Regions:
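Helix-coil boundary and interhelical linker segments in multi-pass alpha-helical membrane proteins
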Residues: 41-51, 114-138, 169-176, 210-222
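N-terminal signal-anchor transmembrane alpha helix
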Residues: 48-71
Length: 265
């Protein structure tokens, strides 16, 4: 009788629920699926920053101007201005090759700002989230640094104009349009690429602080882009000296590019 009563009490007792272990949400490929917490949508890890910065730098350091000129049998570092950028390739190798160099250098900046951060986030199992603009700045700046100080050429690279334009195309497209308009206007008037590039950098450094050219809220993106414009101007120090002396070469529209044996200017 006592045993039967004990069994009845045990049966009437509410069943205790065992703890259910929730899956760990670590990225878009996690078991959480669409229930991924909002905080996991941003990448805060040092690994992500290192991967984005290093990959962008190595892409930016690819010396397309040097490689294109070498394919044409020219050492671009020994002719013209001895710069590996598109302008020297345009003058010393040919117009088409110079345009190709400009587009490829521009593509390096765009890849650093757009492709590399998104790919790094995907490979590491996350998304860029609300800080996408900051990661684009990181990748773009590292790409420009790679072009300016390429590890493949002993850290002696170009001036960063085309690569900066490509970076801005991914970060602040409206600012690119304004800077490009200023660059073209200055080039048509002066026929001097260096002067046009310097003026475009000045226009960018000023306009980037005001809508609709400002890429994001806060002071960091405009500050970084202003410093980048200052870097481009600083890389034109020799050109500024020649402009003041009146010896800076002008772009000759409609003329054939000089031979590789042309002495440096």
């Amino acid at each position: 009788m006592v045993l039967r009563s004990a069994l009845r009490v045990k049966q009437n007792r509410p069943q205790e629920k065992l703890p259910v272990h929730q899956p760990i949400c670590y990225g878009e490929f996690s078991p959480c699926g669409d229930r991924l917490p909002a905080r996991a949508d941003t990448m805060h890890t040092p690994l992500f920053m290192i991967a984005t910065g290093l990959a962008s730098y190595l892409i930016g350091a690819i010396p397309f101007g040097f490689l294109i000129a070498r394919l044409r049998g020219v050492d671009i570092r020994a002719v013209g201005s001895r710069n590996i950028g598109a302008t020297n390739v345009f003058r010393s190798v040919g117009k088409g090759w110079g345009i190709a160099t400009f587009l490829l250098d521009m593509g390096k900046g765009w890849c650093g700002a757009v492709v590399v951060p998104a790919l790094a986030a995907r490979l590491l199992g996350g998304t860029l989230g609300e800080r996408a603009a900051e990661w684009s700045l990181l990748g773009g700046v590292c790409a420009v640094a790679g072009h300016t100080w390429p590890v493949y050429l002993g850290f002696r690279g170009g001036k960063g104009v085309a690569t900066s334009a490509g970076m801005l195309l991914g970060v602040a497209p409206a600012a690119v349009a304004l800077a490009l308009a200023g660059w073209l206007a200055a080039l048509l008037v002066s026929r001097t690429v260096s002067l046009a590039s310097i003026l475009a950098a000045v226009v960018l450094g000023l306009a980037i602080w005001f809508p609709p050219f400002r890429p994001a809220h806060g002071w960091l993106p405009p500050l970084v882009l202003t410093l980048l414009a200052g870097l481009v101007i600083a890389r034109h120090r020799a050109n500024i000296r020649r402009l003041r002396a009146g010896t800076e070469p002008r772009l000759a529209f409609g003329r054939r590019a000089p031979s590789p044996e042309t002495p440096p200017t």
